[in-house]
Every structure is written in C-alpha cells, then in structure tokens.
Amino acid sequence: MRTEYCGQLRLSHVGQQVTLCGWVNRRRDLGSLIFIDMRDREGIVQVFFDPDRADALKLASELRNEFCIQVTGTVRARDEKNINRDMATGEIEVLASSLTIINRADVLPLDSNHVNTEEARLKYRYLDLRRPEMAQRLKTRAKITSLVRRFMDDHGFLDIETPMLTKATPEGARDYLVPSRVHKGKFYALPQSPQLFKQLLMMSGFDRYYQIVKCFRDEDLRADRQPEFTQIDVETSFMTAPQVREVMEALVRHLWLEVKGVDLGDFPVMTFAEAERRYGSDKPDLRNPMELTDVADLLKSVEFAVFAGPANDPKGRVAALRVPGGASLTRKQIDEYGNFVKIYGAKGLAYIKVNERAKGLEGINSPVAKFLNAEIIEAILDRTAAQDGDMIFFGADNKKIVADGMGALLLKVGKDLGLTDESKWAPLWVIDFPMFEDDGEGGLTAMHHPFTSPKDMTAAELKAAPENAVANAYDMVINGYEVGGGSVRIHNGDMQQTVFGILGINEEEQREKFGFLLDALKYGTPPHAGLAFGLDRLTMLLTGTDNIRDVIAFPKTTAAACLMTEAPSFANPTALAELSIQVVKKAENN
C-alpha cells in the first residue's frame, strides 16, 4: 500500500512518485489549495492538493484530524522561503495526485493542542501512541532491545526462555497467583524474576545466558514501578564479580553510545558504606556536588540533647549538609525543607546560615547557635568547608532516619537550587552491600535475595556473625536511578541452607519451597554470578522522560489497573467454579 514512510522523505526523493499511508496530523484549507501534515511512525511530511487535481482536492476538503488515508503524489523541493527547518522533511513537500480515505475518525477524546490528563491518555492509549514523541520512545525501546540482543550474541550469551507458570518463592514481594484447573486447590505463581531458573541453567552447563523477559510483582506501586515489567536478565558461570561488571558496563556504554552518542567512560566503584555516608543513599546521584559530612564527634559534649543524644549513641548519627549559596533561602523555604525531612521520620531540621565567617558568631544566623560555642561552630564550618553565603543543614537521629532524610534533602535541594548538573551522565557501581538487614521484628531479611553469596566468609563464620556479613553484590546506578543489580550466587548447599536458616526458614520449609534447588546444588554446581537490568528504567533514562509509563506501550496505573481494557475485571462464575474458587466478600464495617 505504501512505497515510502512520510518521515523518511528527503531532497533525494525529489521528482519521484511516492505512495504514503498514515494519518492527518493537521489540515489547512486555503480554498484553492489544501495543505495537510501527514504522519506515520517515522514522522510528518507536508502534502498539498491543488486545483489541477480536482478530484483529490475535493476529497481533501473532507479530511479532518486522525483520518487514516493513502496519498499518491510527486515529491517536490520547497521554495527557499517555505523551507521548515524544524521538520526533518522540511525541505520537501508532496503534490498529491490521488487520495483515498481509508477510515474516518470521530471527534477525538484527546486534544492535540493541549496537555491531556494521564487518565485520558491511558484510556485512549491507541490515540496517545500516535503522538510523535510517544512513537519515538517506543522506537527507541525497540532499538535498545535490538542492540542488547546483538551485543549479547557477540559476547557468547545464549537467549534461553524460562517458564512463566512457576512455583511461588519468597523474593521480597507478593506473587501474582494463577489457579490450576487440573490440580484443584493449587496455584502457579507468575515469576518475580527468572532467578532460580537461570541459576539452574548454569548448573546445566549453559555458562552464558540472557533473556529479555516479563516479570511480575504484586506490590504497592510508585511512579517508577509497574506490576509487570521487563528485565534484561543475565547469568554467567566461571566469572568473578568484577568480570561480570566489566561485561555489563560495556553493554550499557554501548547503549549510550549508539542511542545518545555519549561515551559514559569508565564507571567509578563505590562501596555501600561510602555511598550511605556521603550521600545518604545506596543510589547516589553524582551530578549533585553536595555531600553529607559526619560531625557527631564534635557534638558529643554539647548541652543540646537533639545533637548530643545521637552523637553518643552507637546507632545514632549527626550529619551536616552544606548548601552552596543556601544562605539566601527564606524562612518559608527552610520550614518547607523541615517538613520535607519529617516524611522520613526526622523530627525537624536544624541549620546554620553562614553570612560572614570572619565575624565569628556574629557572622552566622542559627536557632541552635546558643547551644554551641564558637570553637565548635568554627570546627563545623571548617569540616564542611563552609563559605560566606552558604547554609548548613543538620540531621540528628538514628542512622537510618538521618541517611533517608538527609539523602532525600540533598537531592531535593540540589534540584530546587539548580546545583545538580542535569546536562551530565553520572554512572557508578555500588558494591559491598550488607548481606542482611533488620526486619523490624528481631529477625533478619536478605537485603537482595536469599541466593546471594557472602563475601569472603565460610558457612560457619556466616552462621556465627550474620550481622557482619557483606554480600558479594553490585548495583549499577545512573543519575540516581538503580538501573541494574546483581550478585555472585551461592553455589554450595551448606552455605545455601545456612542462609535459609538465618532467614528463619526451617529445614522442612526449605525442602518444600527449594528442594529442587538444594538437590541441584549436590551435583557439581559451578560458581556463577549474574545481573538484571530494568529495561523500562533504562529506556526512561535514554528517552529523557521521568515517567516510566511513557516507555511502555500499554502500562498500568499506580493502582495496577488498565484504564483502556478495564482490567482487572470480575471473572465468570462458571470459570471460577471450574477452578474451585469462591470469592468471599469482606464484611462491611458497621
């Protein structure tokens, strides 16, 4: 039906007869001439109808936005004065000789001249995806997956599919369950990741595996999360953690070079402890020049419990954040930041405004200055490298609250005051995570997943001091987003059972849930390691959007619903009966 795409026509096509298929993006009727902007997935070209082709001109008068049409015509060069430098096809136009209206369009529920609500865009997604910026994002996503496949093929990786209907295993979120009609009362789980299957593939001798795969997690959603998402999943045998990172870093550098024309250079490596200390986060945004500075040792003896308490508590922390030029912040802005950190459990936000350091106490403005002597204040200013015109914010509480609150404040202030250089790319690796974290109920939970190997520990050493264990894990972070994470896996049965035991999984439950894995570990398991990238998040970064739904063709809302198809929906009672499922209604509160 077509010979060319609208958006691919150039001066080299001048004089050629072409047939185009697409949609009316805009129509301008000048009486004796009608111009339309005709659009397809590759872009827009101007088509005009003149009186010499009366039948086509007459039919063109009926055109409206989003009519689906076919046009045959001749490509012509535009006059110099009519060239549109803002269009890729702006040097040419098509003189139409024939027009076919393939399908007409009703009045559109989306307005191309205004910003539509996200609810409307998701309900009429098939119209939203016609917009050039949305089409470009999905084209970029397709390019990324193509580049990934070629790179992985070139590096000896095999694309192997793993099951979608599998067994529920604890991986940190709730599973989506699928009832079995054949096995009454039993359920499959949709995979949160192919984690165990890819490890089993390593045990099967396929030493380099990858897969671009759908995963599912029934969890509370955030702006950058979806109940179903796509991973670039990777696993290797006989490779160390640095070797895995080297190959995966090369993949991401390749993507940025091909898609953005940017060489990311070598990625710096930072430990989890350093990232938390300097940035209050395990996914720091290195475009932001600000860092946290520990000052607890300077405040242990002050008669101000807000500072002295955490300063003398082994589980406490007092951190300072120097904001260059922050002395110009208004009282209202300071109060807003104080309320902001309360979201993370902080009780408030102390500060020192540095107006003129040379004047000592008279050169600062601070509600806590009366609790601090000149020597302590000077020591704080020295340690934070404060200069005239700066602001110093303080966080004082337990380590987690300080890290969470001050880390979030660092990011917010950096963005609000334009301190974060958004023209840059700042990738890094974060390594050496704690193996376990407190579950809040006196037990431990795996910080990554229970198949991650500890670093330089025997099973006996791990069992004796699990709280000291460092995971042989690594995350890739770009501009403050975790785009991928992985680890060296446990390849020894005793170690795996030790980890299960630390997590409170008894031997009976181990056999019930992971018997197949424990059996496989008995038969010459190779050392193996892997990683998974979030394809949606990578695409989000590479297309410059901050909304992950912009890079998924048919995404869910934050309530895990599809507004277009109205999924989820009630099931047919007959289908439920076949599955031996009865829906129990919750009793209404009186």
Swiss-Prot record:
Keywords: Aminoacyl-tRNA synthetase, ATP-binding, Cytoplasm, Ligase, Nucleotide-binding, Protein biosynthesis. GO terms for biological process: aspartyl-tRNA aminoacylation. The keyword ATP-binding applies. ATP binds at R217, D218, E219, Q226, E482, G534, L535, D536, R537. Residues 195-198 are annotated as: Aspartate. GO terms for molecular function: aspartate-tRNA ligase activity; ATP binding; nucleic acid binding. Its EC number is 6.1.1.12. It catalyses: tRNA(Asp) + L-aspartate + ATP = L-aspartyl-tRNA(Asp) + AMP + diphosphate. It is found in: Cytoplasm. L-aspartate binds at E171, R217, H448, R489. GO terms for cellular component: cytoplasm. It is an enzyme of class 6 (ligase). PROSITE patterns: AA_TRNA_LIGASE_II. InterPro entries: Aa-tRNA-synt_II, aa-tRNA-synth_II, aa-tRNA-synth_II/BPL/LPL, Asp-tRNA-ligase_1, Asp-tRNA-ligase_1_N, Asp/Asn-tRNA-synth_IIb, AspRS_core, GAD-like_sf. Pfam families: GAD, tRNA-synt_2, tRNA_anti-codon. The keyword Hydrolase does not apply. Homodimer. Catalyzes the attachment of L-aspartate to tRNA(Asp) in a two-step reaction: L-aspartate is first activated by ATP to form Asp-AMP and then transferred to the acceptor end of tRNA(Asp). HAMAP family: Asp_tRNA_synth_type1. PANTHER family: ASPARTATE--TRNA LIGASE, MITOCHONDRIAL (PTHR22594:SF5), ASPARTYL/LYSYL-TRNA SYNTHETASE (PTHR22594). Belongs to the class-II aminoacyl-tRNA synthetase family. Type 1 subfamily. This is Aspartate--tRNA ligase. It comes from Shigella flexneri. The lineage of its organism: Bacteria, Pseudomonadati, Pseudomonadota, Gammaproteobacteria, Enterobacterales.
